[in-house]
Amino acid sequence: MPKKKKTIGEKMSDKKTKEDTRMIAQYFQEMIKYVEKYGNKTILLWQSGSFYEIYTIKDPDTDEFLLSEFNEYIKLTHMNIANKHIKYEYNGKKCSVFMAGFNNTDYLLEKWVKVLTDGGFTVPVWYEYKSVGKKKDRKLLQIFSPGCFFKNNKLESEDCNNIACYSILHSNGSLLKRTPSLLFGCANLNIYTGNLILFNHEVKRQNIHNPVVFDELERFNSIYNPQEIIFIHNYEDENKLQDVIKFSGINCSKIHYVNQSKEGEFTAQALNAENQIYQEDIMCKFYNIPDYDSYLKSSTLNERPIALKSLCFLLNFINDHNSKLTQKIHLPTFDNKSEHLHLANHSLNQLNIVDTAFSK
């Protein structure tokens, strides 16, 4: 049986790489962790003295950069590429290390982080906090992403600084011999105002994979238009998942897909977010709730479990990126509306009343 081809991360994490104690090896090891967690559209900015830098390696045989995000970084920033004149072993080859970067000033760091997040990237930033001789210790400053970064313009920021978690969970009804159903649970946070809006909805019907089923999700998404979405689901068919994105009119710069039916970086966290003990821990961590059971009943969160799931996941996700954003968030309110015009959203789109992915 042929050997399974290793990924870039696996190859770079071989024993020889782990024993490499140079700064450049630490950079690649940390970068791999972030790419595995947040996806390929991740760029690690790394302080090196008076500069912030990003590194890549070039294949000596093909003359190609082996880390695709480096090419996109250059396209976005138009920065010069420099040869560091050091080698890094990759896949048995001695590869040259290249870099690009900018001066370490708050102004330039904010400028380029905004450029990168506007381009749909997640941007971990590591800085030097201690120096002993030539040895410099670094640690994470913050993780920036499209939904966790303030826009510079105040008027723009009130409308655009939304980050959301959508949980879409389906049941085919075969176990209980019931009608197939879809559960929707959404949480949207405006990181500028601290307003937190929830939405919970259930649909039961035989033809469950139908654009009309997603009308309420499309309405919620079009109102808040988040810049970043964590999309939790249990679809096995990736084609159906992409249909859901289209049906819902979701078109944002950064989507994190979390399939809780398959092993992945956020799978355990997504499943934990359904755990009642975990939910209580999360809610009491971020809010001063003296009587949690009473709060659940008064807020009706006990009747809307998937919205609570999305809320808990979102709070933890944002706190991991920037804990300051969770310090002044408001208690959540629900967006569920009982009275809507009974006209499907695709029909409204034809009347130019709503703007969705169908019209793009």
What are these regions (language model features)?
Residues P2-K360:
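Basic, polar low-complexity surface loops/patches
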